[in-house]
Amino acid sequence: MTIYPNLKKIMTKTQSTDFFIACKESRIENNTNFYGCFYLGPFDESLSQTLANDLRRTLLSELTGLAITSIEIEGVLHKFSTLTGMKEPVLDLICNLQNIVLRKETISSTNMNYRATKKTYIGFLSVNGPRVIKAADLKLPAGLQCVDPNQYIATLAEDGFLNMKFNINEGKNYIKQKPYNLDVTTLKKRNILLQNFKNKIGLTALKNKQLMSTTMEGKPLLSNSDNLRFKKSFKRMLTSPNQSLKNKTSLGHDTVSNPIPLDAVFMPVTKINCIIEENNVYSDFSTDPSLEFSTHLVPSLTTQTNLRQESTHKFVNKANSLLQENNLFRSEKVYLPNIYIPEGEGDALSLKGVSPYSDFKTFLSTLNYNSLYQTSLFLNQSLGQNKLLPWQANTLFFDVTNFADSQSNDVNMNMDLAGDKTSVQKIHSTGISNTDAQLNKLSLTKIKSFLGSSDKLQNKTYQSFLQPKYASSNLRTLLTQRSLQKNQSVFMHSFLDDQAKHKELTSNTLRANKFQVMKTVVSIPPKTFKTNPINTFHNQSLTFEYARKF
C-alpha cells in the first residue's frame, strides 16, 4: 500500500497554479484487483460532474485488453456437450475460460476502431486426468501471461482427458459472437441439389448396367477347396474382429470437433468511480481591503448600563489582564472574510410582537457560513487552541458581532420587549471612558431564534441596526468600522432565566446596575458544509462544533 504524503502540499498550490492532478493512493489488493485514487481539478461545481462522467466513459472505451475469442475442443461439437471424465460440462468450462485475465508484456497502442481486434494469438491445452486444471496449465504464446495462475478451469477424473485449442485476440470494449445458424433458404437449396444429384446418378447407373449386361461375361464357379478356404477365413473374422479396424473407427469418432465462438470482454478495468469532492482552497480568507480591521477581532458584544463603581473596577482589571494575555489583540492587522447582507434584509434583525423570540431564517440565509467558519478557525489558531471539530456536529451557532461607532466608543445598545425601540446610553457614573463590553468567546446553542433583553430603559433613544427600518448598508458599515482599541475591556456576562431576568430588570433597585445583552442564536441544518479545512480530502459532511474556552 502506497500513500503519497505530499498530496496536501500539491493541493494547496492551486492558488498559484490552476490545474493539478495527483495520485492519492495506489495499492494491489490481489492478483486481479488493483486500486488507485487520483485527484483532478479544480473545476466549477457544475462542470465537475459532467467532466467526471465523460472521463469515466472515455477510460472504459479507450483501454485495450486481451480475451479468449474462440475454442476448439476435441470430441465436442457445441457448447452444450459433455466430456467423459470431466466434472464440469462444456458450458461451465467456457465460463471459466472467459474469467481468465491475460496481459501483455509490451504496451500496445490504442489506435483501434470500436469493437475491433488486432493480431490473433493461438494457445493450447492438453491434460490427462486425474487432475485439477488451472490457468497455469495453459500453453500461451510468447509475450502473453496469466495474471492469476491459480485461476480454476476444470477437474478431470482418472479416465478423463482434455485437448483444446483456443484463440486470443486484443481489442477494445467487447465482441458478441454470432451463432452458426443455417438459413432456411440454404437448407432448401441443399436438398434440391442433393435430389437432382441422386436422380442423375441413378439414371447413369441404369444405362451403364444395361450396356454392361450385353457385353459382360459370367465368372466361373469356385471349386470345393476354394469354398472351404473362404468359409474358414470368414468364420475367423467373425470370432476375433480386427483390432486395428476398431481403433480406426473409434479414432474417427473421437476426433470430431467444431470451433465454438465466445463473447469476449476486452476491458481490463471494469469499474471506475468519479467522486466529486468540494475543496474551498480559494475561499480561506478574503483579501478585500475594505474589510481590513485594525488591532482587534471580537466575536461577540455585550453592552452595559450603569454598573456599581465598586464592582466595576474589579471587572475592568480582570478584563485588562485577559487582553494582555491574549496574543490575538496584540496583532496590528486582522483580515476578516466578507459578511454581506443585501439591501432590505436587515428587517429580520428586529423583534416582532411581545415574545422575546423571533425567527432568524431570513438573516441566516444571507450569511456566508464558510467565511464565518474560516474566521472562527483563524481565531482558534491565533489563540493557540484547536477546539473546533466541525465534522462531528450538526449545528452552527455564532454571535453577530457589532462594532460600535468610532465616534462613540462607550455606547451601549439595548433592545426592548416590543422590538420597536432600541436604547443606546453613554456611561456616565462608572468612571470608565472609551470602554465597550465585549465577549471573547462564541456563545453556542441549538435554538433557532433571536433573543433580546426584555426591559425598557428610561434613557435617550437612538436609531440602531435593530430597528425594523434599518438599512443593510448601515449594518455593513458597523461591521467594517475600525473602532476597538488595544486597551478596551471585555465584560463577561451570564444568561438568566427569562422570568427571573424580567423581575430583576423591572425592579427599582437593580435597573441601573444590570447588563443589557443582545445575543443571536441560530441553527444550521445538517450537511451544510462539505469541506474539512483540517483534512480537506475526506469526503465528510462538515458543520460547526462547540468551541470551548475560545
Curated annotation (Swiss-Prot):
Primary location: plastid
Chain intervals for the UniProt region annotation (Insert): 185-258
Localization terms from the record: Plastid, Chloroplast
Gene Ontology terms describing biological process: DNA-templated transcription
InterPro entries per the UniProt record, alphabetical: DNA-dir_RNA_pol_insert (IPR011262), DNA-dir_RNA_pol_RpoA/D/Rpb3 (IPR011263), RBP11-like (IPR036603), RNApol_insert_sf (IPR036643)
Region ranges (Alpha N-terminal domain (alpha-NTD)): 1-333
E.C. number(s) listed in UniProt: 2.7.7.6
EC primary class: transferase
Presence of keyword Transferase: yes
Any one GO molecular-function label of the UniProt entry: protein dimerization activity
Reactions mediated catalytically: RNA(n) + a ribonucleoside 5'-triphosphate = RNA(n+1) + diphosphate
Region of interest: Alpha C-terminal domain (alpha-CTD): 378-550
A GO CC annotation given for this chain: mitochondrion
Keywords, sorted A to Z: Chloroplast, DNA-directed RNA polymerase, Nucleotidyltransferase, Plastid, Transcription, Transferase
UniProt keyword Nucleotidyltransferase, yes or no: yes
The family this protein is said to belong to: Belongs to the RNA polymerase alpha chain family.
Domain notes: The N-terminal domain is essential for RNAP assembly and basal transcription, whereas the C-terminal domain is involved in interaction with transcriptional regulators and with upstream promoter elements.
Function noted in UniProt: DNA-dependent RNA polymerase catalyzes the transcription of DNA into RNA using the four ribonucleoside triphosphates as substrates.
Oligomeric form and interacting partners: In plastids the minimal PEP RNA polymerase catalytic core is composed of four subunits: alpha, beta, beta', and beta''. When a (nuclear-encoded) sigma factor is associated with the core the holoenzyme is formed, which can initiate transcription.
Name of this chain's protein: DNA-directed RNA polymerase subunit alpha
UniProt source species: Chlamydomonas reinhardtii
Taxonomic lineage: Eukaryota, Viridiplantae, Chlorophyta, core chlorophytes, Chlorophyceae
Gene: rpoA
